[in-house]
Regions:
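Short amphipathic alpha-helix used as the core "switch/output" element in two-component signaling
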Residues: 45, 67-80
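C-terminal output helix
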Residues: 112-121
Length: 128
């Protein structure tokens, strides 16, 4: 089954530069329906207001981290099946294990490029 290239994607990061980079990488890959949030609390609010086909979130943010946001998403019956990719500079094995246990679908360590993002996207949402 082909991936819906118009599916809404939520990217979450507290750094505007990173939001712009991820948005541009997604655009290079053909995804244009992208929304943004700058912390987990804002992302949770947006996720409850709109059904996203994919969430890509940073780990380290305040006041709600990406990890806390992930746990909230997985605990919410309406959101629990939303594909979720964690993006972070944290490559510690403990963080990867914690994210996997919390239900993350994939994990990307910064810095990354379009090829890395595409590989992770294909693993989560399918080929495009």
């Amino acid at each position: 089954m082909a991936v819906d290239m118009d599916m809404p994607i939520l990217i979450v990061d507290d750094y505007k530069t990173m939001l712009r980079i991820v948005r541009n990488l997604l655009k290079q890959l053909g995804f244009n329906n992208v929304d943004e949030a700058t912390d987990g609390a804002m992302a949770l609010e947006k996720s409850r207001a709109r059904q996203y086909g994919l969430i890509i979130s940073d780990w380290n943010m305040e006041p709600m981290t990406g990890y806390e946001f992930l746990k909230e998403v997985r605990a919410d019956t309406q959101l629990k099946d939303t594909p979720f990719i964690m993006v972070t500079a944290e490559s510690k094995t403990d963080n990867v294990i914690a994210a996997k246990k919390a239900g993350v679908n994939n994990y990307i360590v910064k810095p990354f490029n379009a090829a890395t993002l595409k590989t992770k996207l294909v693993a989560v949402v399918g080929d495009f």
